[in-house]
Amino acid sequence: MNRALVLTLAALAVAPVAAFADGPKTKVTEVAVKDIPAAVTSVVKAAAPGMTIKEAELKERADRRYYDVEGVMPDGSEIEFDLLEKNGAWEIVETQRDIAWASAPKLVQDTAAASGKAIKPVRVIESKQTDGIVIYELFAAGKPDEPSMEVSLKDGKAKVLAEVWPH
C-alpha cells in the first residue's frame, strides 16, 4: 500500500474515537437540599416516604436534565434516585442502593463467576430500572470510580454486560 493510503485509513480509524471524546459534556451542579425543586422532592418522597434527603446534583447534558438525589432511610440504609426531566415533569429512571455481595441473587453471583473475570467485589450497587431490569455494578478493590463488571437481571435471566449501562 502506498503511504498516503495507509495514513488516510489510519486517520479514519481513529476519527470516531476523537468525535466521541468531543461529544456533549455533562455539566454537574451541586444543589443544596433547600434548593431542590418541589416537583423533584415530591417524586422522591412519593417513592420513599421516610427518606431524609442529604444531597443532590443537577446534571445537564445536551438536551437532557437529571437530578441525582441521595438520602437515608429510617433504618439507616442509603438510597439514591436518578430522575430525568421529560416534557417538564420529573420521573425516576433508576433507584440505587449498596448491598453486600452475599445479598445479590445467586444467579447474578454465578453469572459473574462464570464470566472468567476474577473479580471479588468490595462494593456492589444494585440499580433498579423502571422497566424491571436490575443492574448489579461490581467494584473491585482499588478501583472505586468505575465498576469492573456489570451484571443485568431480568425475568430470571442474568448476563454480564459488554458495555456500561447508560444511567
Regions found by a protein language model. Give the residues of each.
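Long, terminal "pre-/pro-" and other extracytoplasmic accessory regions
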Residues: 2-7, 11, 16, 20-167
